[in-house]
Amino acid sequence: MPSLLFTCFLVQLLIHLVNTFGADAINNLLWNLYNMFPTPTSQSAGEQKKLKREFMKVRHEMNATSSQDEFAKWAKLRRQHDKLFDQLEKSKSSLDSTKSTFDSSVSTLRWLGTNGLRMLLQFWFSKQAMFWLPKGWFPYYAEWLLSFPRAPLGSISIQAWTLACAAVILLVSDALVAVVALALGTQTGAKAKKMEEPMKAGGQGTEKPGKKEL
């Protein structure tokens, strides 16, 4: 049953990725990808990004302009700022309702493709053995637990296989995170040490010898 074994592992991996990155981050990524294609909201989303860039540019210029020394220029930038802000709010409100519907649809499809599919597989193949244990290697209670709830005694049930996949994926994920964190910490420490050495050398070179006391 290699195909079913791999399917269960893949579903559990997808569930772990969703839980790791978060549903909101995935929804935002899919929303941006959706608007890259010629969809009904792609034009509005593009205009909103353009308005946001113009708004940030005008806001930066307004903050860099003195309202006392250059009042005329500041007042003009202020009017542009308020106008772009109103346009940006209107564009955002019109897209928020569409994005809310999009997020609900994506969340439903994501649940059906991960947790829903896992529940369906566990129900449909609950009486089927994933693979068989070597006879006589495990005591009766261990065989009963591994075949729980309805798989043949002496076999691995789909529920036990799913739990094993989840445990392995979690262990590998934690190990990878620890290795990456250790590597980044080592690099940061080495860079900090290299920056400290020239500072110490410069400080020692500028020290003036004091008078020795007898």
From Swiss-Prot:
Residues 193-214 are annotated as: Disordered. Pfam families: CHD5 (PF04420). The keyword Plastid does not apply. Residues 1-4, 132-155 are lumenal. Keywords: Coiled coil, Endoplasmic reticulum, Membrane, Transmembrane, Transmembrane helix, Transport. One of its GO terms (cellular component) is GET complex. Gene3D superfamilies: Helix hairpin bin. Residues 25-110, 173-214 are cytoplasmic. It comes from the Eukaryota. Residues 75-97 form a coiled coil. It is a multi-pass membrane protein. Its main location: endoplasmic reticulum. It is found in: Endoplasmic reticulum membrane. The chain crosses the membrane at residues 5-24, 111-131, 156-172. InterPro entries: Get1, Get1_fungi, Helix_hairpin_bin_sf. GO terms for biological process: tail-anchored membrane protein insertion into ER membrane. One of its GO terms (molecular function) is protein-membrane adaptor activity. PANTHER family: GUIDED ENTRY OF TAIL-ANCHORED PROTEINS FACTOR 1, TAIL-ANCHORED PROTEIN INSERTION RECEPTOR WRB. Belongs to the WRB/GET1 family. Required for the post-translational delivery of tail-anchored (TA) proteins to the endoplasmic reticulum. Acts as a membrane receptor for soluble get3, which recognizes and selectively binds the transmembrane domain of TA proteins in the cytosol. Interacts with get3. This is Protein get1. It comes from Botryotinia fuckeliana (strain B05.10). The lineage of its organism: Eukaryota, Fungi, Dikarya, Ascomycota, Pezizomycotina. The gene is get1.
